[in-house]
């Protein structure tokens, strides 16, 4: 138990050190299961790669399975058998070879069950506010007297993670340059919305969004997706 607790703490601290959030770790016979959320690296793949590298640097025993969260909803499960982790730690294979040989699936049910009694999340993202800036470039060629109509905007947004799957977004559009007139030259609201993600069993995902969308559209949007295990 002491060794397992030490390994859990080491994995958790390694993930904290690279900025991961919503971290949980649990030991079951022969398997270390870890869940985390990447809100640091803009590329999901970069974030996952950093997390794998951090976990491989920890002294886990047995197989290693990582659950990748998005807005605290499980999205992917990455499986690294003990033969693979030991080969990497012994210098027999490279990190690239680990990526090539590890298993990836959308089916996270078993892994999340293993984390059921893992306790509170470390570095929770709930009620955390992020300030994002999105560049926006619009080009259109539909007139004979001008080569292009264009608009360049900066769209700062405040994004707040709420409860599990819940998110609030408030965005403003700041025009930088344009040859259009009217509203396109004015500061105006962008996306102001509240969304809720849900994961059902058997890889079915749902998302409901209500609020103000682009182009002055108000309303609600419902998405349902199914993903195969691969």
Map each language-model feature to its residues.
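Transmembrane beta-strand segments that form the barrel wall of outer-membrane beta-barrel proteins
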Residues: 1, 33-38, 131-143, 168-176, ...
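Solvent-exposed loop/turn segments connecting transmembrane beta-strands
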Residues: 42-44, 142-150, 164, 175-188, ...
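A short amphipathic beta-strand at an alpha->beta junction
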Residues: 56-84
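Outer-membrane beta-barrel biogenesis signature
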Residues: 93-129
């Amino acid at each position: 138990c002491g060794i397992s607790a030490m390994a859990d703490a080491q994995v958790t601290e390694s993930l904290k050190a690279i900025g991961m959030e919503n971290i949980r770790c649990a030991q079951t016979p022969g398997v270390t299961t870890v869940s985390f959320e990447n809100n640091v690296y803009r590329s999901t793949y970069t974030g996952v790669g950093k997390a794998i590298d951090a976990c491989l640097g920890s002294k886990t025993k047995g197989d290693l399975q990582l659950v990748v969260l998005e807005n605290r909803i499980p999205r992917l499960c990455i499986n690294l058998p003990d033969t693979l982790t030991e080969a990497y730690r012994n210098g027999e294979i490279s990190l690239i070879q680990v990526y090539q040989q590890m298993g990836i699936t959308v089916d996270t049910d078993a892994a999340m069950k293993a984390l059921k009694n893992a306790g509170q999340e470390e570095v929770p993202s709930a009620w955390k506010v992020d300030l994002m800036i999105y560049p926006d470039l619009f080009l259109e060629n539909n007139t004979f007297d001008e080569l292009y109509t264009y608009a360049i905007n900066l769209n700062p947004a405040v994004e707040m993670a709420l409860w599990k799957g819940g998110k609030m977004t408030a965005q403003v559009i700041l025009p930088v340059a344009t040859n259009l007139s009217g509203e396109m030259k004015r500061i105006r609201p962008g996306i102001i919305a509240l969304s809720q993600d849900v994961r059902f069993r058997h890889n079915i995902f749902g998302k409901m969004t209500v609020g103000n969308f682009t182009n002055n559209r108000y309303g609600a949007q419902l998405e349902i997706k199914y993903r195969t295990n691969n």
